Design a protein with these regions (language model features):
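Extended, charged coiled-coil stalks and adjacent low-complexity, Ser/Thr- and Lys/Glu/Arg/Asp-rich tails
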Residues: 1-93
Length: 93
């Protein structure tokens, strides 16, 4: 059982590292999406409604929103799974 304990501890450490790396990756992507969103709103404010393509604005915003939801949904699942594994590891002691 000692080997199993060490294997589980190693798996938890690996999962922790993967979680941090994925969080950082998603944070960078979310920053790019936020920049794109800022550009969209700036363009919208800079033009009269007749001159700016609202279809493009709506389509791009929908894509940005969907990607953000995907990012944070995946991150939330990873966090919940990691939290569960931490609790299981604590209970094994």
């Amino acid at each position: 059982n000692l080997l199993t304990f060490h294997e589980k501890a190693d798996e938890l450490i690996e999962e922790e590292e993967e979680l941090r790396n994925k969080h950082l990756e998603y944070l960078k992507e979310a920053a790019k999406l936020l920049t794109e969103e800022g550009e969209l709103i700036s363009n919208l404010q800079g033009f009269g409604n007749e001159e700016y393509d609202m279809d493009e604005y709506v389509n791009r915003m929908e894509r940005i929103i969907k990607r953000n939801l995907d990012i944070y949904g995946d991150l939330q699942q990873r966090m919940q799974r990691f939290k569960k594994h931490m609790q299981e590891e604590e209970e094994a002691h």
